[in-house]
């Protein structure tokens, strides 16, 4: 298997406990398998060193597991979850993060943790730390961490800290008068920077694709919007908004259901025969269904309830809910993504955009359309431009005027 030059460079730097960092579509999967085959198992000429070979466990998204995406890359190394198709005599397991707890007692194997989920200190992170103590492993990520706290599980797994308590004692200062534990700042960050540099293996490469990003201004019902802002009022339920989350939800529904968005989508679908459309809320999906049915455009869906494939017709749209489908799959049959509404998370937006920007895409030019209205959408966009997550509480405290 011949790798691209940027993958070869990364392979030489990889080591046990590292995070392979590559943009979406950079080929992290094939590079991680090359590391397992060549460095961990002493593979050469499609043969493993019998004394070095280890069973392989891949923890990935449910979608990647169910679509058998990993199996395509495994074939280059004669690896397969099917024992009859894997001549090396090693066990190969591909499963989702939801089931990581099932493998806490596995020892002397090699784990690839795909689409990093070990952020925070929940059940998945605790299972990951337990597995890391008795196995070799690497992590794959396009966006490894936004804050130092995101790195706690990986730093513990590498033996730099005994537990979260030690990390907190050495590096975190909490806000004095907060109602709940709130981080005010981090200290001794020089040490953290050195440790992070020792585990990150960047996979940099120059993309041949040209990205064309267009931000389209949608309208809003001004009267409804101002009534909500001034009175913290939900016009859909005719009752007060109970908190920042509900108030922001109402504002977003006001702008996302504005008729101008229908007009914009119809125009874009007239210009592009095939497109992926990302959305946040179920009411947006209902609007998009209506548009496609009216225009007689075939469409498929991927959300919490439906897992339909991408259509194979000449003209189609694929309606994808961010949480369900921002990562773990790709499509090289279209050059267009439309973001019907913006997601709060920079990480999710980046992952979503990468569904069409792959190494093997046949398109030179890729088109991205972002729909946004004045007001709350502008604030979300500002947070995304700063590579941060939109904060509803901050927006609520700044913008809303209660009676």
Model-identified regions with their sequence ranges:
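A conserved SF2-helicase RecA2
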Residues: 344-353, 357-403
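Conserved P-loop NTPase motor "coupling/switch" region that bridges the ATPase
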Residues: 53-55, 110, 127-207, 361
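SF2 helicase motor core recognition
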Residues: 22, 27-29, 100-106, 120-121, ...
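Conserved Walker A/P-loop ATP-binding site and its immediately adjacent core
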Residues: 31-34, 49-75, 146-150, 281-282
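Conserved pre-motif I regulatory segment
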Residues: 1-20
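Walker A/P-loop NTP-binding motif
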Residues: 12-18, 29-50
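Conserved helicase/translocase motor-coupling segment
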Residues: 208-300, 304
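Conserved helix-turn-beta segment of the N-terminal RecA-like "Helicase ATP-binding" lobe
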Residues: 63-88, 158-161
């Amino acid at each position: 298997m011949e790798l691209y030059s940027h993958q070869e460079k990364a392979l030489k730097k990889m080591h046990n406990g590292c995070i392979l960092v590559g943009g979406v579509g950079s080929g992290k999967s094939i590079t991680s398998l090359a590391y397992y085959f060549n460095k961990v198992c002493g593979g050469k000429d499609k043969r493993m060193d019998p004394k070095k070979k280890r069973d392989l466990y891949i923890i990935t998204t449910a979608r990647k597991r169910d679509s058998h995406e990993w199996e395509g890359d495994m074939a280059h190394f004669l690896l397969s979850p099917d024992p009859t198709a894997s001549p090396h005599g090693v066990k190969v397991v591909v499963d989702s993060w939801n089931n990581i707890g099932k493998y806490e007692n596995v020892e002397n194997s090699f784990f690839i943790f795909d689409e990093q989920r070990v952020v925070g200190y929940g059940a998945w992170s605790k299972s990951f730390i337990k597995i890391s103590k008795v196995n070799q492993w690497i992590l794959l990520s396009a966006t490894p961490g936004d804050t130092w706290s995101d790195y706690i599980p990986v730093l513990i797994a590498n033996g730099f800290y005994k537990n979260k308590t030690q990390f907190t004692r050495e590096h975190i200062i909490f806000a004095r008068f907060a109602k709940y534990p709130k981080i005010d700042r981090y200290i001794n960050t020089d040490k953290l920077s050195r440790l992070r540099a020792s585990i990150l293996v960047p996979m940099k490469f120059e993309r041949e694709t040209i990205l064309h990003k267009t931000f389209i201004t949608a309208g809003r019902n001004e009267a409804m919007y101002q009534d909500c802002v001034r009175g913290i009022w939900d016009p859909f339920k005719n009752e007060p908004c109970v908190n920042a989350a509900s108030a922001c939800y109402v504002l977003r529904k006001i702008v996302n259901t504005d008729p101008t968005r229908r007009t914009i989508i119809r125009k874009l679908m007239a210009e592009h025969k095939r497109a992926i459309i990302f959305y946040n809320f179920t009411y947006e999906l209902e609007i998009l269904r209506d548009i496609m049915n009216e225009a007689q455009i075939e469409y498929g869906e991927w959300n919490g309830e439906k897992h339909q494939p991408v259509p194979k017709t000449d003209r189609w749209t694929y309606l994808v809910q961010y949480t369900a489908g921002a990562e773990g799959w790709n499509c090289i049959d279209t050059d267009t993504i439309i973001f019907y509404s913006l997601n709060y998370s920079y990480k999710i937006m980046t992952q979503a955009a990468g569904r069409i920007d792959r190494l093997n895409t046949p398109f030179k030019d890729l088109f991205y359309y972002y729909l946004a209205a004045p007001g709350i959408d502008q604030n979300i966009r500002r947070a995304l431009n700063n590579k941060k997550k939109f904060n509803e509480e901050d927006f609520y405290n700044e913008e809303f005027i209660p009676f």
